[in-house]
Amino acid sequence: MGQLKQLAGILALASPAIAAFSVYALHDPDALKASLGVTSECLSALNYTVECDGPSAVRATKNSDNDPWSMDDLTTLCTDGCSKSLSTWFDAVEQKCEGEEVTINGLVVDPKAFPMKYISGYDLACLRDSNDNWCFYEAQDWDSGVFTSWDKKQPDACSGENPPADCDKKGSEEDVDTLYVTNSYDKELYCSECFMLLWRQRIESPVFPQGNLLDHFTKQFSKLEAACSTKLPLTTPAPTVVLGAKDTLPPATGYHTDGSTVFRYSSPPAPTITTEEPIAKRTAAPRAMKTFYTPATPDRTPQLGAMAPCGKYYNVVAGDTCASISSEFEVTMDELLTYNPELHPNCENLWANFAICVAPVSPNPMTVDGSCGENNAGATCDGSPFGSCCNNEGRCVPCGPEATAAPDAPDAQGQTVHDDEPPEEPHIEEPPKDIPAGDDDDRKKAKLPLPSGKYPLPSNSTMISKDGSCNEYISCVGSPFGVCCSTSGWCGYGKPWCGVGNCVSGYCDTEDKASGKPQ
């Protein structure tokens, strides 16, 4: 909290927070209270409305080197109002949840863990040196496998649900020597104020993984001080939010850091025995489960942020993990996160008694033989040479009097069949005439200007994506799946979809925007 309050005094940015968020805004309070096992007063504090930009605040908690931030991103998050609001949130939880515990899928959590995680992400992202340089922004240009290995490798390997047995083993002295930070950077860089402030900020964070990793980073900080002939006060926070002293926990409970000092298992998780790669690392598995062409209706409150429409929901029960759900429904962890964007990568917010999306709504396949409808694998007639309407016998026919569907009633594909005149076929926008044939790649890389205000909808002649797939003529803008169509043909937000070279259509980043430099 000391770093946050100090930053609150120096971050005198004029622009206010552009949005606000609360962690459980869309959940039913009674169901959530029963699931978490807390009082109404504590739940109200946990659900405090934080005056920060929500997507940026969540992004900061993930703290990944694979997710580059622009200056606009940082100034959106790092406001004086956001800093003060995070501090107020922590104080409210500390007061209203005193003595309470939150139980989440076998984890016992001190409620303070939730605001502390957001505060820690904010402190790191918004850190500036005495010359007002943004340290986190500058660090994105530093190149070394040592400093970034914690973000890129350690959480994936050692902070997941089933960490390898050697995660807590110390390496040989020879291995340790090769990891000295002073052997990996130029002295001018590692003695810079930003470098040392960032290093200290990480190890002072209450959510930095405890154990050998913290010991190693602390020793490296001492080497930095000695090499740079400087001394910075260092306070390693006591794990005050760990529920029970670590040395009093029975070994069988499997003390679980999960990227934080605030979690422990209330009961040991079932061991996972497999010769395959971790589910999160697998490529897309052939899906044995049914493909869904119509939206499903959940019979429980959906997981916060679950995609809509969703082809299939699964009701989470106590003891489920993301790994077990991924395995059961033959989806990768990346796919599960795509279907449930607000789900944290370490699955700490996977709630029992809520519905999680495990399959998307897929587009109907085009008929190949003139058969159509639900009894024919959901095949659609639209655009087929057999006719664009599906009759009651499951055959494609031309729309009009010869179609057997009831007049002025929707057919199997949702089209209205008239008995007086055939409906007009949907118009697909042709490619621009001034681009010669063969220049498809250049057209895909064309940069569209960034809009001001809300994203305007595409023209009536452009189809809007119904399932997250897209191309030059099926737009993501106006769909719930994103505002950019990537080169892989899927809608989304952020650099993997909107970045220069990654974006086919929609609100693609320009070179200036992608550079992250103020315009």
Curated annotation (Swiss-Prot):
PROSITE patterns: CHIT_BIND_I_1, CHIT_BIND_I_2, LYSM. GO terms for cellular component: extracellular region. Residues 312-358 form the LysM domain. Residues 407-458 are annotated as: Disordered. Residues 314-358 are annotated as: LysM domain. Residues 417-433 have a biased composition (Basic and acidic residues). Residues 407-416 have a biased composition (Low complexity). InterPro entries: Endochitinase-like_sf, LysM_dom, LysM_dom_sf. One of its GO terms (molecular function) is chitin binding. Residues 467-510 form the Chitin-binding type-1 domain. CDD domains: LysM. Residues 1-19 form the signal peptide. Keywords: Chitin-binding, Disulfide bond, Glycoprotein, Secreted, Signal, Virulence. Pfam families: LysM. Glycans are attached at residues 47, 460. Gene3D superfamilies: LysM domain. It is found in: Secreted. This is LysM domain-containing protein ARB_03442.
